[in-house]
Curated annotation (Swiss-Prot):
pH-activity dependence text: Optimum pH is around 8. Activity decreases below pH 7.5 and above pH 9.5.
Localisation: Cell inner membrane
Name the record gives this protein: GDP-mannose:glycolipid 4-beta-D-mannosyltransferase
Pathway: Glycan biosynthesis; xanthan biosynthesis
Length: 349
């Protein structure tokens, strides 16, 4: 059953106060802006608390809201992983015994990496305890017992006060954490095969592995058109890098929800991405000329023709992101929490 997020947002006069424990740490300068903006958007009736295992095991709260639950189960060391998984099992027993509802946001259809049978078993247990799911795009399959649709918010306000660069003609950009599934190795190979002298490629982000770092550094050394900033970058730097490009290129091997795509659109930059049901829905939502979708292989023939296609495409001054405003998103999360508790969710609207 899917709850629509299309109702008008108003503040209820007597909204029930609830305490929500989030599975993430207290926001800081390095926190994912999606999370920071969500916490800021929650209405006053929601008292947020942030995760520590001690807090989760020993304190009282009305709802546990999980984002990326696999990260509660992982540690760089084997013993650390076992300890975290044992603590997580205790937490799940507590939730089951107390009847504390779990709300879970579906950022990915499945974790990007498989870390073994214990993690898989604990994630299945979490799934069984989840009272209400939040999907952040309307193409994600619904899950029982209830799934609410609350679209991923934009980053327009987040970057509004940050300096932006003058666009560099022909600049292509790939940014974000550099992981194998994002196809950066294919992008580098294709760029070397492209003969168009107008094009240059910029890679910005922190490599997930030493092998990924070496791959990008080697490509930069072999082709003067390719440059990179291989580090975690603060948002002001990211705003300048994104605004400097003509096109953001995301040749992901798999793509369902992408904060990177929405970040690029929030800074009014066109994006090239693989066709998927979710990407096609975003392309329709934001208007023509902003999201360019390809099917099949990502190759030199595709990339060679993109610059002229992007320049020729009619588009408005900015993509339409009105369905992704944060005040609305905060109220809709409050409604989900109330309904997970068996209360009237309309009190939130």
């Amino acid at each position: 059953m899917s709850a629509s997020a299309s109702l008008p947002v108003t503040r209820a006069a007597a909204a029930p106060r609830i305490t929500v424990l989030f599975s993430t740490e207290k926001p800081n300068a390095n926190t994912n802006p999606y999370l920071t903006q969500l916490y800021d958007a929650l209405p006053d009736a929601v008292q947020p608390r942030f995760f520590s295992m001690r807090e989760a095991l020993l304190s009282r709260y009305d709802v546990l809201h999980l984002h990326w639950p696999e990260y509660l189960l992982r540690h760089p060391s084997k013993m650390g992983t076992l300890a975290k998984q044992a603590c997580a099992a205790l937490l799940l027993m507590k939730l089951q015994l107390t009847g504390t509802p779990v709300v879970r946001t579906l950022h990915n259809l499945a974790p990007h990496e498989d870390r073994g049978w214990r993690e898989r078993a604990l994630l299945r247990w979490i799934d069984q305890l989840t009272r209400r799911w939040i999907r952040i795009n309307a193409t994600t399959p619904v899950r029982p017992p209830f799934t609410d649709t609350i679209l991923h918010g934009h980053y327009r306000d987040w970057f509004a006060t940050m300096e932006q660069s003058t666009t560099l003609p022909g600049r292509l950009l790939h940014f974000g954490l550099i992981r194998p599934y994002k196809g950066v190795e294919v992008l580098l190979d294709v760029m070397r095969d492209v003969q168009d002298p107008r094009l240059s490629l910029r890679i910005v982000g922190n490599p997930a592995t030493p092998x990924m770092r070496t791959l990008v550094e080697t490509a930069c050394a072999q082709d003067a058109r390719i440059s990179a900033l291989l580090a975690y970058v603060e948002e002001p730097v990211l705003a300048r890098e994104v605004s400097a490009c003509e096109l953001v290129v995301l040749p992901y091997k798999q793509m369902h929800n992408s904060g990177t795509l929405l970040l690029a659109l929030s800074l009014a930059r066109p994006v090239l991405a693989p066709w998927s049901e979710s990407n096609a829905a975003i392309a329709d939502e934001v208007g023509p000329g902003w999201v360019f979708l390809y099917e099949g292989e990502f190759d030199a023939a595709l990339l060679s023709g993109m610059l002229d296609q992007v320049r020729a495409a009619p588009r408005g001054p900015a993509p339409d992101l009105s369905q992704r405003d944060w005040p609305r998103i905060g109220q809709l999360h409050y409604r989900t929490y109330l309904e997970a508790l068996g209360k009237d969710g309309d009190a939130a609207l």
